């Protein structure tokens, strides 16, 4: 059985989130949660919340052994960017893109 959770429009950069997501792919859920809990950056906290949500979704399914769940796949896609302007010297302005991410975590039973 598979369990999934999705977080959309999260205010973290997709590029930085993929760096953290690559580390938990294929790990048992308990190990992945420990790794994310002690990783000191913003994408780790967001991924931790999505992983907890996927685990809670798995607990709602009958006949699923939550202790044997592994992270099957972590997908980080780019969401829409917020465009902002930063004032510069002599009346100029620079555009800043505040990027967002769509994050999906898929858990599966068994060892992979």
From Swiss-Prot:
GO molecular function, one term: structural constituent of ribosome
Cited CDD domains: Ribosomal_L22
Superkingdom of source: Bacteria
PROSITE patterns the UniProt entry points to: RIBOSOMAL_L22 (PS00464)
GO cellular component: cytosolic large ribosomal subunit
BP terms from Gene Ontology: translation
The entry's keywords: Ribonucleoprotein, Ribosomal protein, RNA-binding, rRNA-binding
SUPFAM superfamilies the record matches: Ribosomal protein L22
Its biological purpose: This protein binds specifically to 23S rRNA; its binding is stimulated by other ribosomal proteins, e.g. L4, L17, and L20. It is important during the early stages of 50S assembly. It makes multiple contacts with different domains of the 23S rRNA in the assembled 50S subunit and ribosome.
Quaternary assembly: Part of the 50S ribosomal subunit.
Family: Belongs to the universal ribosomal protein uL22 family.
Protein name: Large ribosomal subunit protein uL22
Gene: rplV
């Amino acid at each position: 059985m598979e369990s999934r959770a999705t977080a959309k429009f999260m205010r973290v950069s997709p590029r930085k989130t993929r760096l953290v997501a690559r580390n938990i792919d294929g790990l048992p859920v308990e190990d992945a949660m420990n790794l994310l809990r002690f990783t000191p950056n913003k994408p780790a906290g967001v991924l931790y919340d999505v992983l907890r949500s996927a685990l809670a979704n798995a607990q709602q399914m009958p006949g699923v052994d939550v202790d044997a769940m592994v992270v099957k796949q972590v997908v980080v896609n780019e969401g829409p960017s917020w465009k902002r302007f930063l004032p510069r010297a002599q009346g100029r302005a620079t555009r800043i893109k505040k990027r967002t991410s769509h994050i999906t975590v898929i858990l599966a039973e068994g060892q992979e």
